[in-house]
Amino acid sequence: MFQPSPWRADFPAIAALQRQHQTYLDSAATTQKPQALLDALSHYYGHGAANVHRAQHLPGALATQAFETSRDKVAAWLNAADSRQIVFTHGATSALNLLAYGLEHRLEAGDEIAISALEHHANLLPWQQLAHRRNLHLVVLPLDAHGRIDQDQALQLIGPRTRVLAISQLSNVLGTWQPLPALLAHARAQGALTVVDGAQGVVHGRQDMQQLGCDFYVFSSHKLYGPDGVGVLYGRAQALELLRHWQFGGEMVQLAEYHSASFRPAPLGFEAGTPPIAGVIGLGATLDYLASLDAHAVAAHEASLHQHLLRGLGDREGVRVLGAPQTALASFVIEGVHNADIAHLLTEQGIAVRAGHHCAMPLLKGLGLEGAIRVSLGLYNDSDDVQRFFDALDQGLELLR
């Protein structure tokens, strides 16, 4: 039975891709953009662009107002207590590096940083390199058979020497939600700061920072149907005060002398130089669009398509799905077939999926794999997209076997 997407027409690129005989199933890498975002970018550039927080002239005042209004919208979307808890960066990777450098002064030799075995490189490498610089111990929390952090083992490994716990909310490879409430509460009890990589999780349902209770939460705009080049760092007010400035330049400074300077607090103190103004304004427009949708209908649509995807993969001989995916994506391997070969055949048939290690090399290596195919869904996908994928997969398997 055909399952349409009520929001498909809101994304003009989907129709353009269809005219190119392309089926887009790579939304965990980046999403297509709604018309509301395109309109906001066109309006900003077409009605007078200007820098923010600098000038008294009308274009500058209007740009600053729009920029700060977007900060308010992000704070509301995350249910942050105050918009000053929202720092704009150039991506989730940038935000995580900010945290690793900004917290470095608080760590000393022998301290521990805990991450999980499923982390994206963006939430692995900044902490790994910090551990090298400061002679710290990087503790890797193991997974259970379903692809979730093994809670019992994690609670044993997070101890009094743990200074930072940095974990993903939703795995970009396994599609599994992680047991954040128990892990965050335990880490807080041990005196550790908590960092949540929400790059995937923020896309699926509203995330409530006051309820979640982490110290820091990061995500990228482009995975949330917003523009690229924009990241968000949320921080508890007390946690933001612990960060040391790590990038220096225009507008983050309070007073500059030739031999000394004082710096602004968050958020502006961590937004050195010209920020991604158009992107931030565009993110605000995207959040307005998303807020206008029926959240229950979106969740039901994604869940139904995801079940269709999982059933179809499970019905095909030799196909093994990694872990126990819960939301919007599935990674799989095929017995006796290299992932690059099947990816090539899918690409030739106009199916846009991801193949490889998905920026999580240690995870794939731990699973004994060189790579996998990942199919990931967006709110614009419909059941015909999934069926076209299955038809192409079946043709590819017939050729390769």
UniProtKB/Swiss-Prot annotation:
It is an enzyme of class 2 (transferase). It holds the Pfam family Aminotran_5. Keywords: Pyridoxal phosphate, Transferase. PROSITE patterns: AA_TRANSFER_CLASS_5 (PS00595). SUPFAM superfamilies: PLP-dependent transferases. GO terms for molecular function: cysteine desulfurase activity; pyridoxal phosphate binding. GO terms for biological process: cysteine metabolic process. The modification N6-(pyridoxal phosphate)lysine is found at K223. Its EC number is 2.8.1.7. InterPro entries: Aminotrans_V_dom, Aminotrans_V_PyrdxlP_BS, Cys_dSase_SufS, PyrdxlP-dep_Trfase, PyrdxlP-dep_Trfase_major, PyrdxlP-dep_Trfase_small. It catalyses: (sulfur carrier)-H + L-cysteine = (sulfur carrier)-SH + L-alanine. Its cofactor is pyridoxal 5'-phosphate. It comes from the Bacteria. Catalyzes the removal of elemental sulfur and selenium atoms from L-cysteine, L-cystine, L-selenocysteine, and L-selenocystine to produce L-alanine. Belongs to the class-V pyridoxal-phosphate-dependent aminotransferase family. Csd subfamily. PANTHER family: CYSTEINE DESULFURASE, CYSTEINE DESULFURASE 1, CHLOROPLASTIC. This is Probable cysteine desulfurase. It comes from Pseudomonas putida (strain ATCC 47054 / DSM 6125 / CFBP 8728 / NCIMB 11950 / KT2440). The gene is csdA.
